[in-house]
Amino acid sequence: MRQPLPEWMINLDMVGRQGKKIRIPAMTPQSMYRVYSRAIRELGYSPEEWGVSGYAILDDHVPFMERGVDTLNLIDDFQDGNWWHTSKDNIGILGEKSFQQTGEMTLHILRQLLPGPPST
């Protein structure tokens, strides 16, 4: 028996680089774009580090999106520098602040998407 698809999914890809520039794809569904934008605003994050790509990004989220799942792909701008898929693409480029912010962003988004405790 085939399992039902989720309503939404978040894909984290290459989010730990020092000096990261997280971009979501231009084709991100509006519902997920609003959640992402709200999180940036409420967390006070810089638009230099958190923004929207000017182009479509083919990544692990695409098969979900093609099946009607609202997707949010948080991905570092891999064209920013000459490290991607080279010998420079290693643990030495990772930064604690990048992981901290990405974790905070992800939790903030999840709090918006998941139902809260029942009202009494």
Give the location of each predicted region.
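Active-site-adjacent substrate-binding region
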Residues: 8, 15-120
